[in-house]
Amino acid sequence: MKDLFNAIAATSGQNTYRRPDSSSVIYPEKHAIDIDTLLAKQSIEYPAGTYMMNMITNHDLNSWEGTEFERLGNLTRAMAVLTYTLPGMPLIYTGQETGLNRALEFFEKDMPPTWTPRNDYFEFYQKLNHLKHTHPALRAGSSGADMKRYPTASDDIYVFSRKDDGGATIYVFANLGKSDAEVKYTGEAPAKDITAVNFFTGRTDEFPTTLSPGEYHIYVSR
C-alpha cells in the first residue's frame, strides 16, 4: 500500500522529497483506481482472513524516502483515512500522531516527539482510532465487512463502502488527484435516500458531488 500511495502522490505532483544528492525518486504513474488492482492482487497472494498492514509511513520510509508530508503532500490525511478504512490494520509510526515533520535518526538514539500540547493531528488520529475500534465493519481479517466499490468517471476519485451484518455502514470518499473532480458514477452509486452522518463534523450531510485535491470524507449510516 505504501509504495502505491507514494506513486499516486508523485503522479499528483505532491512528492517533494529529494535524496541527499538532491536527486528525486522516480515513481510509475499511478492513480486512485490502481488501489483496486492492488487489493485484487493481495486477495490472490494472501490467505483469506490475512491482516494486511496499511501505512503511510514507517521507520524505513521516514529515514530514507522522506516524511509522509514530503512524499504525500496534501494527500497525507486522505491516505491516512484509507489506511484505516480499507481492509487491513493501520500502522502508526512514532510521531505520526503528532504531525512530526522530520526524519528520525535510524541508527542513533533520537529525541521522541512532543505529545503535549495536543494538536489537530492528535485529534485526527484519535478519531480514526476510535472509529477503527468501534465500527464493526472495520474489523480486520475475516471479521471485517467486505468492501463495495462505486466506480467513477475520474481515475483519481475513490469511493467505497463497508457494511457489517447488522447493517452498520461506512462510506468513504477521497480525491487523490491534482485537480477538482466531479463524483460522477459509472456504475452503481450509493443510494440517495441514505441518512448518513459525516464522521468528522458530526453533521447529517448529503454525499459530495465534487471533491477538491486531497479532500476526504467518512460517512456513517445505520
Sequence positions of predicted segments:
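Active-site-proximal helices and loops of the catalytic beta/alpha 8
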Residues: 1-52, 82, 99-131, 136, ...
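Active-site clefts of carbohydrate-active enzymes
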Residues: 47-71
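Beta-sheet entry/capping signal
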Residues: 51-53, 89-92, 168-171
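Conserved short secondary-structure transition element at the edge of the structured enzyme core
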Residues: 81-98
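Short hydrophobic/aromatic beta-strand or adjacent loop that forms the aromatic wall/cage
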Residues: 155-157, 168, 213-218
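Asparagine-centered strand-capping/turn motif at beta-strand->loop junctions
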Residues: 173-177
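Solvent-exposed beta-hairpin/edge-strand motifs
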Residues: 187-202
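C-terminal beta-strand-rich structural cap/linker in extracellular carbohydrate-active enzymes
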Residues: 205-222
